[in-house]
Structure formats: C-alpha cells, structure tokens
Amino acid sequence: MEIWQKAVDLAVKFHRIAERLDQRRLYRYAEQLRAAGLSISNNVAEGSGSAHKQEFIQFLNITRRSLFEDASMLLVFEKLGLLESAEVDELLWDCDEESRKITNFSRKL
C-alpha cells in the first residue's frame, strides 16, 4: 500500500532527526517526534486490518492528525534553531503530500 510505504519512509526520517535531538540531550522532543512518526505508519497498518470501511477511515484520520502533529513539531524545532529551514521545508512537503494521498485514499474507500 503506497500510503503505508510513504508513512514508513517518513517515520525513518523522523527517527533520524530524533537521534540528532538525543545527541543534544533533548530526549522529550526526540521521544515525541518518534512516537508521532511511528503513529503514522502504525495507524495505516492497524486500520487496514479493520473489518469495516468506516473503522479504517477513522484510523486514516488519526494518521492525518499525527502528520499535523509532526509538522507542528518540525516548525517549533526550526524556530528553536534545532533544524535547518531547508530540511523542515522538505519534510513539510512530504507531510503535506502524504496527507493528500491519505485523504484521496479515504475518499475512494
């Protein structure tokens, strides 16, 4: 499933950023980013096992909310000088693209 694969790719990117935050001893930031990043792919996977279409759509909505949570954290980290603008811009683009794909996928269910 394309949206799941993209979600996994995003989770890996967020995990790598979290590792850099850990090196700066920003453990809470790192853990929050990891959790929200993993939530994206986990909710797509869990929702795909739903017996009912509406339940799957609910999981996809949770997935989108996790994307927005990650995007918010990225913007805060940028403002704090923890991430470069170019990296944040690229990740925000990825989040937006994934959000649109999830929305389109949900509508087709």
Q: What residue spans do the PLM features occupy?
A:
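Amphipathic alpha-helical assembly/interaction segments
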Residues: 1-109
